[in-house]
């Protein structure tokens, strides 16, 4: 019998082993769809971003008007821009749900896959930040000023580091130029890291909702999960299209319709919604360096989760106390997101501080204790 080209060709063989004949657990739920959704987000963002870059000018005098020109005069430029801007929001929705799934089902015990995933999150956050600066509106400019300024809190080298990042003594033309270069480069880095992420995942195979080995019951990825993924794509791309067509500015800041002006500070400087939880943690500490450390810790804490797993069971499926704690953590993050969008005034300051303390307490103290407690209750 002639060999199947899908299984013998050096390149097709790799695609076959990761997308067609990949042995997958038969019981993985819709929570396992977000990986492929993130892949679609990345592809959409690179495509729309490339089309936008062909019409964009990375110069302080022209950036704002070049974006306006794209929306007004380029064929479907408005649609490309709206898909790109809102695509970022969907990217973050998917990655947060993907991380939440990994946390709930103990997927972090695949340490290499988890760590590359956290690096991917950090790279995505960096990409979104530099991208937000490019339209050169008021919030772009002041957001860049505030966030880059945080590096000056680093002892001894801080100020030098900030001026080096700016390419001068303030956020100006050199800053915009290098941010555009970074925004163009980083998505391709994300694509490269994604292949590493998948390589590590395919070493162990997928986890599943029961957290037990699924070697005794595997099914091929195609046609079962290819079809399931395509359903996921339509369920994500439909709301994205609706948002981009009907209310494209819903998630944006009205301040960004005003061109950047270093002489006028907006009344409330705040980042896009997907950074608000971290921004709230940053603001909740009165000390600059302390705030920066808390901000970094809020994301870097994810690297510690594999070491804080004390339960004998992998997933939270049969651990009700941990489940309760997990949903309290989710609620807490929503509270932080809301507080981050509010002005720095009386009730919000204390709410933010309490929510920040709760966030770290749950992750660092309560989860390991609960895991150990459940072991005792189950007589492990």
From Swiss-Prot:
Entry note: cofactor: Binds 2 heme b groups non-covalently.
Q: Which residues cross the membrane?
A: 34-54, 78-99, 114-134, 179-199, 227-247, 289-309, 321-341, 348-368
Q: Which residues bind heme b b562?
A: 84, 183
* Alphabetized UniProt keyword annotations: Electron transport, Heme, Iron, Membrane, Metal-binding, Mitochondrion, Mitochondrion inner membrane, Respiratory chain, Transmembrane, Transmembrane helix, Transport, Ubiquinone
Can you tell which superkingdom this protein's organism belongs to?
A: Eukaryota
Give the multimer and partner information.
Answer: The cytochrome bc1 complex contains 11 subunits: 3 respiratory subunits (MT-CYB, CYC1 and UQCRFS1), 2 core proteins (UQCRC1 and UQCRC2) and 6 low-molecular weight proteins (UQCRH/QCR6, UQCRB/QCR7, UQCRQ/QCR8, UQCR10/QCR9, UQCR11/QCR10 and a cleavage product of UQCRFS1). This cytochrome bc1 complex then forms a dimer.
Family statement drawn from the similarity comment of this UniProt entry:
Belongs to the cytochrome b family.
Name the chain's protein. Cytochrome b
| Protein source organism | Pelecanoides magellani
């Amino acid at each position: 019998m002639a060999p199947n080209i899908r299984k013998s060709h050096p390149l097709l063989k790799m695609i076959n082993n990761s997308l067609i004949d990949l042995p997958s657990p038969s019981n993985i739920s819709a929570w396992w769809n977000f990986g492929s959704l993130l892949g679609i987000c990345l592809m959409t963002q690179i495509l729309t971003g490339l089309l936008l870059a062909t019409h964009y000018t990375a110069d302080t005098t022209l950036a704002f008007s070049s974006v306006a020109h794209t929306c007004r005069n380029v064929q479907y430029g408005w649609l490309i821009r709206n898909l790109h801007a809102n695509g970022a929001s969907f990217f973050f929705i998917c990655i947060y749900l993907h991380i939440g799934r990994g946390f709930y089902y103990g997927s972090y015990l695949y340490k290499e896959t988890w760590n590359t995933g956290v690096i991917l999150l950090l790279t995505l956050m960096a990409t979104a930040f530099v991208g937000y600066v490019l339209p050169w509106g008021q919030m772009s400019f002041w957001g860049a000023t505030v966030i880059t300024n945080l590096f000056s809190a680093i002892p001894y080298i801080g100020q030098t580091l900030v001026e080096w990042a700016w390419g001068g003594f303030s956020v100006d033309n050199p800053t915009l130029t290098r941010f555009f270069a970074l925004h163009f480069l980083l998505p391709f880095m994300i694509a490269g890291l994604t292949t590493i992420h998948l390589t590590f995942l395919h070493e162990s195979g997928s986890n599943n909702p029961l957290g037990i080995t699924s070697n005794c019951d595997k099914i091929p990825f195609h046609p079962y999960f290819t079809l399931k993924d395509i359903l996921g794509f339509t369920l994500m791309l439909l709301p994205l299209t609706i948002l981009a067509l009907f209310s494209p500015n819903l998630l944006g800041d009205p301040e960004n319709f005003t061109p950047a002006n270093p002489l006028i500070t907006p009344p409330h400087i705040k980042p896009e919604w997907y950074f608000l939880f971290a921004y709230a943690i940053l603001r909740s500490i009165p000390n600059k360096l302390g705030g920066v450390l808390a901000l970094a810790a809020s994301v870097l804490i994810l690297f510690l989760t594999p070491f804080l797993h004390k339960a004998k069971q992998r997933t939270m499926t049969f651990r009700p106390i941990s489940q309760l704690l997990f949903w309290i953590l989710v609620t807490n993050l929503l509270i932080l997101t809301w507080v981050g969008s509010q002005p720095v005034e009386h009730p919000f300051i204390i709410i933010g501080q309490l929510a920040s303390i709760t966030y770290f307490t749950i992750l660092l103290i309560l989860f390991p204790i609960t895991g150990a407690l459940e072991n005792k209750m189950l007589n492990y």
